[in-house]
Amino acid sequence: MTQGQKVSVGIVGASGYGGVQLVRLLKEHPLVELAYLGGDSSAGKPYSDLYPHLGHSINLNVEAIDLEIIASRCQVVFLGLPNGLACDLAPPLLAKGCKVLDLSADYRFTSLDTYSKWYGKERQDQAIASTAVYGLPELYREDIKNASLIGCPGCYPTASLMAISPLLKQGLIVPETTIIDAKSGTSGGGRQAKINMLLAEADSSIGAYNVAGKHRHTPEIEQICGDLAGHEVRVQFTPHLMPMVRGILSTVYATLRDPNLVRDDLITIYNAFYRASPFVKILPGGVYPQTKWACGTNLCYLGIEVDPRTDRVIVMSAIDNLVKGQSGQAVQCLNLMMGWEESLALPQMCFYP
């Protein structure tokens, strides 16, 4: 695709926080025409009824999900649906010639048995699923360029894998010692009403949830860690809910194989590993990332430290869960699939303060 042709794009499941972020990014993309917004409960409503602040710029209604209409209008379709629905829509859309980017978990796993175990839905589409590419450009850039089906990563896996990938790929740590302590803002829980997301419940409080390997992002993280390490890897992953709207801070701990490695060595290694990755910012020694720095951007900030007392490396990763952790990363994949500049239309300046 040349750098001047507009591509018609549709979003199925545009009513949530990830959906409205995707609408914003695609509306501002110079090579994209937003041609379709689809949904179920919101079908028939102007999009501005859901998000009044967009009434001046988005003149589209949310339409019922109709595969024939979608395929007739759209060259590319983003699926922003709850887990378990995309796997019913993606195969017919692919058969009709659409490229598909799925923001749910349906196409993140190489093993459908793993998916079924964690997400509770039996699948028979292994042939289609096997063609999906995991949409983390910093690891699978070349595969994404040639893909028709992308399984976009989860927000926690994105932040965590960006932190640990260089260590695993180069065999610098003992993989089984990996501990991931991650904290997310409330927008990661979606737009539907939930008691624990109420201001009175979430404000001035921090708490862990889905502890001891119960979070669904655990097998996703372990799958990619295993791919990088060349063998099965188990990690200890504990997520926390923070009293903020946007952002994820993931802190990864692991034991170094070589206790003589120092912080500056690792900073050099990380800079080399991510040298072709425009959205990864390796911080200088002694500087550690904050979620506010990434707010509204597709950036991932990485801070690195070594504790010589314990021979552990500590890597901190900060992203915006709705941008690099979801919609922005999906647009990053779109840019690669279309042969465009990877960073096209993706923000790199944060909302601050």
Curated annotation (Swiss-Prot):
Q: Where in the cell is it found?
A: Cytoplasm
Which SMART domains is this protein grouped with? Semialdhyde_dh
GO terms (molecular function) for this protein are: N-acetyl-gamma-glutamyl-phosphate reductase activity; NAD binding; NADP+ binding
Query: What is the name listed in the Swiss-Prot or TrEMBL entry for this protein?
Result: N-acetyl-gamma-glutamyl-phosphate reductase
CDD domains according to UniProt: AGPR_1_C, AGPR_1_N
Print the organism lineage. Bacteria, Bacillati, Cyanobacteriota, Cyanophyceae, Oscillatoriophycideae
- At the top of the EC hierarchy, this enzyme's class is oxidoreductase
Please give the function described in this protein's UniProt entry.
Catalyzes the NADPH-dependent reduction of N-acetyl-5-glutamyl phosphate to yield N-acetyl-L-glutamate 5-semialdehyde.
Catalytic activity reads: N-acetyl-L-glutamate 5-semialdehyde + phosphate + NADP(+) = N-acetyl-L-glutamyl 5-phosphate + NADPH + H(+)
Gene3D superfamilies recorded = Dihydrodipicolinate Reductase, domain 2, NAD(P)-binding Rossmann-like Domain
**What gene is it encoded by?**
argC
SUPFAM superfamilies per the UniProt record, alphabetical: Glyceraldehyde-3-phosphate dehydrogenase-like, C-terminal domain, NAD(P)-binding Rossmann-fold domains
